[in-house]
Amino acid sequence: TAMDMEQSNTATSGGLNSSAQMTIGMGSLGTVQFNDVSGSAANAIDDILPKAYEETWDGTSHSSSFHSFGSSTQSGSVDYRLPALSFGDMSLSLTATYDPNAGSGPASAGGVAGNDHSGVAYTAKIDSGMGLAVGGGIEEVTTASTATGASDLTRATGYVTYSNGPLSIGYQEMFQNTENAGDST
């Protein structure tokens, strides 16, 4: 049976997305999170800029890949999230993500996952405690190709945001080695 949702979408129409994560908190040792569908820490910083509704590119037709950071390690992966380290008002947050089958989601119950290579992602964020935050990350997927010139896929992003009362501004850049991306995965 289909579950009726807002705007006439049903659970079988493809008009909605469900994401589930399992988190194991270990106190001062941090958190381990098992990710399914956009759950990784890397995928969470694909677009960190302030927004009133959603990302500025939401609902548009485009070929931009700036928001693809974390997309290869977001489903079927495992995160380790270090507890925030505090230095007065400042804090430092670090994460590491491992995906044994980067670019593919986990296998269905009783199934076998596709044969993609592994990927890793790392993120860091420094929060000043006074509205300024600086962060970034790197994501790498090992090559699945033995073709001459094939190399690993690498994505990186960095951002700065500032909030003071109702005012929020930000700047973010993203890099992807597009020349090699076709040879990877």
At which residue positions do the language-model features occur?
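Outer-membrane beta-barrel proteins
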Residues: T1-T185
